[in-house]
């Protein structure tokens, strides 16, 4: 009886969901015509550098990387954004503690009995 080794299939077909997102093996055709030599430092002819932009056919092929998030922007606790979307909960359990949402706050920020009181609904004269 053979023992399964790490990285080997135990048979039975595909066990991952890759078949939903990857093309069939017979559909994959290697394209070796677009390979280029990466070791040279020569600039291709016809390239014009304008500031940070390159004007040529190869400029269309370059991929622009997204700017990485600043540490402040990626962490809402130290972010300069308003703190209206950070709530502290006092419940005991797995979902207790700091709750961060992107919704605006609906918390009433007035003193009890103050201008946000619903006394006018119940006949209070002061409201």
UniProtKB/Swiss-Prot annotation:
Biological process terms in GO annotation: cortical microtubule organization
Record keyword Lipoprotein present: no
Biased amino acid composition, Polar residues: 76-98
Annotated GO CC locations: cortical microtubule, transverse to long axis
Residue ranges, annotated region (Disordered): 1-100
InterPro entries per UniProt: SPR1/2/3/4/5 (IPR039613)
UniProt entry keywords in alphabetical sequence: Microtubule
Record bears the keyword Glycoprotein: no
Lineage: superkingdom: Eukaryota
Biological function: Acts in maintaining the cortical microtubules organization essential for anisotropic cell growth.
Family, per entry: Belongs to the SPIRAL1 family.
The name this protein goes by in its record: Protein SPIRAL1-like 4
